[in-house]
């Protein structure tokens, strides 16, 4: 019978196959291979191990190694890559659990129980001694928090954490942006802010390709594709995909306004409204244009202003390719491609001098969720559905539009009163009633003999 070596029983994966395995399956693969080596080592057949070139049967002193020593040397030395194929070396870059020196060689968890300062053993174990020491320095097990904030009483484990916390009370901001001058209390906040100037957005959506500056913004955006709404209101059952919208909704039920101005006492339900109010008190506009000197409160407004100077036009028409610097300009341009042009309420059918909002463009992109139960036709607006349902019911609303006259003003009120037969203006002398005040005034002058105007 031929000698069985480790290469005869090892299972090798290609790069494509290894990428399809999840972390649990990879861990299972490592455990099975380690268990296989244990069985071969327990047979204590020198030919089996020497044939694979895996490990020496004797140490440097010439003494024969025990089974436990063989396994320990196998797991600690960089032998996984040579025994289990090239994929162990190639996959080590993609494996998120790799180490600096041993790419995919996962050592078995060495039992190094955590000990607190009192000597009480804890259940957590560490693979490396330095990780255990780092854990002890954090005082996680002893829960010793020696640094207390004098203002709010909050406790901290490290003095540096207390110093960062005190900046929130004092408003101290040491880290300043070189481009716009805005200051921050933490360097991580400054690094995130600097990306707004460079335009870097490292987090991209795989569904639509939209990029984001922060990871949580990408997470909230992905929920718009999946329809996930993990934040549900306990009172009305309404779901939200964003925690900020959920908190604002809860405040509406509670009627509370947590953001209160210290200067005037005015309270706000939304943090953004509160920030705008505080800027009005401070009178500061941190975003100033270097070319014309105009200042803005918000970075988005400042960025839109900069486009005027550099001629940037990011809003492009999908039909003709024409670009615009403002989204409102793009909406107005898109109406020229639409079949229907917005008209005023006048009876002559002339277009209004001031264009109305782009309802034609919005109606093309808006999701049609309102469905007619009679014919099944869908609409994007509830008002459009109500108007459509009147065709089935035969209902005719009492308004000025039913008589073909423009709505609004005194004439509109007269037309409505004429339809319903209402005549509120009554003459005290003859008892005649009128629906229009102007006609009533002319009738009163007929009794007095006065004329509204004289001819020369």
UniProtKB/Swiss-Prot annotation:
An annotated GO cellular component of this protein is: nucleus
Residue intervals of every C2H2-type zinc finger in the record: 147-169, 175-197, 203-225, 231-253, 259-281, 287-309, 315-337, 370-392, 425-447
Question: Which InterPro entries did the record assign?
Answer: KRAB, KRAB_dom_sf, Znf_C2H2-type, Znf_C2H2_sf, Znf_C2H2_type
Question: What Pfam families does this protein's entry cite?
Answer: KRAB, zf-C2H2, zf-C2H2_4
The main location is: nucleus
Q: Where is the KRAB domain positioned along the sequence?
A: 4-77
Q: What is an annotated GO biological process for this record, any one? A: regulation of transcription by RNA polymerase II
Keyword set for this entry?
A: DNA-binding, Metal-binding, Nucleus, Repeat, Transcription, Transcription regulation, Zinc, Zinc-finger
**Claim: Repeat is one of the keywords in the record:** yes
Q: Region (Disordered) spans which residues?
A: 93-125, 331-365, 386-406
Please name the GO terms that the record assigns under molecular function: DNA-binding transcription factor activity, RNA polymerase II-specific; RNA polymerase II transcription regulatory region sequence-specific DNA binding; zinc ion binding
Q: Where is the composition biased (Basic and acidic residues)?
A: 93-114
PANTHER family attached to this UniProt entry = RIKEN CDNA 6720489N17 GENE-RELATED, ZNF44 PROTEIN
Supply the name of the protein. Answer: Zinc finger protein 556
- Please name the gene that encodes this protein: ZNF556
């Amino acid at each position: 019978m031929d000698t069985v070596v480790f290469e005869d029983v090892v299972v090798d994966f290609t790069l494509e196959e290894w990428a399809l395995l999840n972390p649990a399956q990879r861990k299972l693969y490592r455990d099975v291979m380690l268990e296989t080596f244990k069985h071969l080592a327990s047979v204590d057949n020198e030919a089996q191990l020497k044939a694979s070139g895996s490990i020496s049967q004797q140490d440097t002193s010439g003494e024969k190694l025990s089974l436990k020593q063989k396994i320990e040397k196998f797991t600690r030395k960089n032998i996984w890559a040579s025994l289990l194929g090239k994929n162990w070396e190639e996959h080590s870059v993609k494996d998120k659990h790799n180490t600096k020196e041993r790419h995919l060689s996962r050592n078995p968890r060495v039992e190094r129980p955590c000990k607190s300062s009192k000597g009480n053993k804890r259940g957590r174990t560490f693979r490396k001694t330095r990780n255990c020491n780092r854990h002890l320095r954090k005082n996680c097990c002893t829960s010793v928090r020696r640094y207390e904030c004098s203002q709010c009483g909050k406790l901290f484990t490290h003095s540096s954490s207390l110093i960062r916390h005190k900046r929130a009370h004092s408003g101290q901001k040491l880290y300043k942006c070189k481009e716009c001058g805005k200051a921050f209390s933490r360097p991580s906040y400054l690094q995130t802010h600097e990306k707004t100037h460079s335009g870097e957005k490292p987090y991209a959506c795989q569904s639509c390709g939209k990029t984001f500056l922060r990871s949580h913004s990408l997470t909230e955006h992905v929920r718009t594709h999946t329809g996930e709404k993990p934040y549900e209101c306990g009172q009305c059952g309404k779901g939200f995909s964003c925690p900020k919208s959920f908190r604002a909704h809860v405040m509406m039920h509670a009627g509370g306004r947590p953001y209160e101005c210290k200067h005037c006492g005015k309270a706000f339900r939304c943090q953004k409204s509160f920030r705008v109010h505080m800027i009005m008190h401070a009178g500061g506009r941190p975003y100033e244009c270097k070319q014309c000197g105009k200042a803005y409160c918000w970075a988005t407004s400042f960025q839109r202003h900069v486009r005027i100077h550099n001629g940037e036009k990011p809003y492009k028409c999908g039909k003709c390719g024409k670009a615009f610097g403002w989204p409102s300009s793009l909406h107005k341009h898109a109406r020229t491609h639409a079949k229907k042009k917005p008209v005023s309420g006048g009876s002559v059918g002339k277009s209004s001098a001031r264009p109305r909002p782009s309802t034609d463009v919005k109606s093309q992109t808006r999701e049609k969720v309102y469905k007619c139960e009679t014919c099944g036709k869908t609409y994007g607006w509830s008002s459009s559905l109500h108007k459509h349902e009147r065709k089935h019911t035969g209902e005719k609303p009492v308004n000025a539009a039913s008589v073909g006259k423009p709505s609004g003003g005194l004439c509109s009120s007269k037309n409505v009163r004429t339809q319903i037969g209402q005549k509120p203006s009554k003459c005290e002398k003859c008892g005649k009633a009128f629906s229009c005040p102007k006609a009533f005034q002319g009738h009163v002058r007929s009794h007095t003999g006065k004329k509204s105007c004289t001819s020369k």
